[in-house]
Amino acid sequence: MTEVGVAVVPVAAILPLRAAVLRPGLPVEEARYEEDELSATLHLAAYDADGRVVGCSTWFPDPLDGRDAWRLRGMATAPEVRGSGVGARLVEAGLAVGTERGYGLTWCNARTPAVGFYRRYGFVPVGEEFLAVHDIPHYLMVREART
């Protein structure tokens, strides 16, 4: 596992990585979300030993099917650290905050190749595959809090 620290940061700290991984070739502003500046939004950065941001995730309240829920969006890891546990640290940290805030349901729209990754943390695909931004295949994935 790559040695990383995870910290709560302002969106400006993670936007360059989010843009490079999730919106390659587009202006950085294309990677901004409406929810980025909400007071309840949580931005997490994973830092390597040199202080470089190598992973990021954004979490915020967003109801699903009429239920209060915690949503994960903008999950990204630098290509050179994929498979090293950086993503795991980010998901575990974000889920822990959701639990602290009382959310029993967490959800995300996961890119199809990442479905297996999210399954490891208790997320389950719901419904059919769909095309999201820039026609990239995704699945809605939900996770009920473990009791």
Descriptions of predicted regions:
Residues 18, 118, 123:
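Conserved active-site tyrosine of GNAT-family acetyltransferases
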Residues 45, 52-62, 68-76:
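Conserved beta-strand in the GNAT
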Residues 81, 85-93:
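Conserved acetyl-CoA pyrophosphate-binding loop and the N-cap/start of the following alpha-helix
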